[in-house]
């Protein structure tokens, strides 16, 4: 297979990934592959572009490094072109409502007829099967959070609240990435393709597992946090200092002993309620939990963030200032690791945003291209799989493909 023009880099160089999906979840999987060196083809509808394009800045991050193909993959010759593309594809990711592709005639079996080694990842809100009530419903971030038990655990004691920005989309997209790579590993061993059914609500069910286990195995459900503090453990969560907010985790025998001395609670150490060797203070079960919070709040409020960070570093207590977005760029850790970077858009502008993660030492990722325009690479991709100029123009004339103007 001849690859499309692009630099060779990263741990996934030589891999061809194709995705069909809009907005965030499915495309985030494609974004990860593209930043790790895979050749990633983004399929968009011919009649209208991905709705993410209406956003002024985010698409320049989420669609960088991609090749843009505008093709009607469900109709006539457009479907034929899509299936021909699948013959040279390693991983295909589609994000839609339930078994939408199967309903339109593109089943796993049809895809495997064209490529027996193809890894297929289906990403939907409620999965490829189940009840009629749910399987075919649309889903976005908040829907998946609400249906999974994740949302009800977040927020404040007075009201649940979804986690933003778009947590379920990103977790689901990353799940698609890792699952597809796991499947590809097996395919290269057996020569037999794989189909993966990723339900966003099940991803979030798993992400919300920590507190749920107490309910599933005893009927006890953890309360929601209060003002950003850990619902179970004192000294853990969000706290206010004299000049702003920090988060901290009061965990460890020595850490608790030294902190208690600072906040005036040394006399509680070694009591039946806080015996020697205590590593965590339970907010509810320990009768001194509320007092610990009261004393800690007072001590923190009397000190600046810088003072708290210095003292906690001496005590080996984990803490961090709650940074505002403007503070990120100048933070020395961000600067040292180049966590924020710049790249050129296709129209020559400079765009700034998060850098590639994680950092591969021997085969690093790379930003080699900005977001392509609608249909920008259609002709190049179709030529790559054997279509002539006349073939491409015929698809365009029938409204089955769009090429860049």
From Swiss-Prot:
Q: Which residues does the record give as CoA binding sites?
A: 97, 104
User: What is the reaction catalyzed?
Assistant: crotonobetainyl-CoA + (R)-carnitine = crotonobetaine + (R)-carnitinyl-CoA; 4-(trimethylamino)butanoyl-CoA + (R)-carnitine = (R)-carnitinyl-CoA + 4-(trimethylamino)butanoate
- Gene Ontology biological-process annotations: carnitine metabolic process
- Where, by residue number, is the active site? 169 (nucleophile)
Keyword Cytoplasm set for record: yes
State where the protein is found.
Cytoplasm
Question: Cross-referenced SUPFAM superfamilies, in alphabetical order?
Answer: CoA-transferase family III (CaiB/BaiF) (SSF89796)
Pathway listed for it? Amine and polyamine metabolism; carnitine metabolism
* Keyword vocabulary terms for this entry: Cytoplasm, Transferase
Query: InterPro entries under this entry?
Result: CoA-transferase_III, CoA-Trfase_CaiB, CoA-Trfase_fam_III, CoA-Trfase_III_dom3_sf, CoA-Trfase_III_dom_1_sf
The EC number on file is: 2.8.3.21
Q: Which Pfam families did the record assign?
A: CoA_transf_3 (PF02515)
Q: What does this protein do?
A: Catalyzes the reversible transfer of the CoA moiety from gamma-butyrobetainyl-CoA to L-carnitine to generate L-carnitinyl-CoA and gamma-butyrobetaine. Is also able to catalyze the reversible transfer of the CoA moiety from gamma-butyrobetainyl-CoA or L-carnitinyl-CoA to crotonobetaine to generate crotonobetainyl-CoA.
The text of the family note is:
Belongs to the CoA-transferase III family. CaiB subfamily.
Protein name stated in the entry: L-carnitine CoA-transferase
Organism field: Shigella flexneri serotype 5b (strain 8401)
State which gene encodes it: caiB
């Amino acid at each position: 297979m001849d690859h499309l023009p692009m630099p060779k880099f990263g741990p996934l160089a030589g891999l061809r990934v194709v995705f069909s999906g809009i907005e965030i979840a499915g495309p985030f999987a494609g974004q990860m592959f593209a930043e790790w060196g895979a050749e990633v083809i983004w399929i968009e509808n011919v009649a209208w572009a991905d709705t993410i394009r209406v956003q002024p800045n985010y698409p320049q991050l989420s669609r960088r490094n991609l090749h843009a193909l505008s093709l009607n993959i469900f109709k006539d010759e457009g479907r034929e072109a899509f299936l021909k593309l699948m013959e040279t594809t390693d991983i295909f990711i589609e994000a839609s409502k339930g078994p939408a592709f199967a309903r339109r005639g593109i089943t796993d079996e049809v895809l495997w007829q064209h490529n027996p080694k193809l890894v297929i990842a289906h990403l939907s809100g409620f999965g490829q099967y189940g009840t009629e009530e749910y399987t075919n419903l649309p889903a976005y971030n908040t829907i998946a959070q609400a249906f999974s038990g994740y949302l009800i655990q977040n927020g404040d004691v007075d009201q649940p609240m979804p986690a933003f920005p778009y947590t379920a989309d990103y977790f689901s997209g990353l799940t698609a990435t890792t699952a597809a790579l796991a499947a590809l590993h097996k395919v290269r061993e057996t020569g037999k393709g794989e189909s993966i059914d990723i339900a966003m609500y099940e991803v979030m069910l798993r992400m919300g597992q920590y507190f749920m286990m107490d309910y599933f195995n005893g009927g006890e459900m953890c309360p929601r946090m209060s003002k950003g503090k850990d619902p179970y453990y004192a000294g853990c969560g969000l706290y206010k200092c004299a000049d702003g907010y920090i988060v901290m985790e009061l965990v460890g025998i020595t850490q608790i002993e030294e902190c208690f001395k600072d906040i005036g609670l040394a006399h509680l150490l070694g009591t039946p309620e806080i015996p020697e060797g205590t590593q965590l203070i339970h907010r509810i079960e320990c009768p001194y939990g509320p007092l610990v919070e009261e004393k800690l709040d007072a001590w923190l409020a009397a000190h600046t963030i810088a003072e708290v960070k210095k003292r906690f570093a001496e005590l080996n207590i984990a803490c961090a200032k709650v940074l505002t977005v403007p503070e990120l760029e100048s933070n020395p850790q961000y600067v040292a690791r180049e966590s924020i970077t710049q790249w050129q858009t296709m129209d020559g502008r400079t765009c700034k945003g998060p850098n590639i993660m994680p950092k591969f030492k021997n085969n690093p990722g790379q930003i080699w291209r900005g977001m392509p325009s609608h249909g920008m690479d259609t002709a190049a991709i179709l030529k790559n799989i054997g279509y002539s100029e006349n073939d491409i123009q015929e698809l365009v004339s029938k409204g089955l493909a769009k090429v860049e103007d």
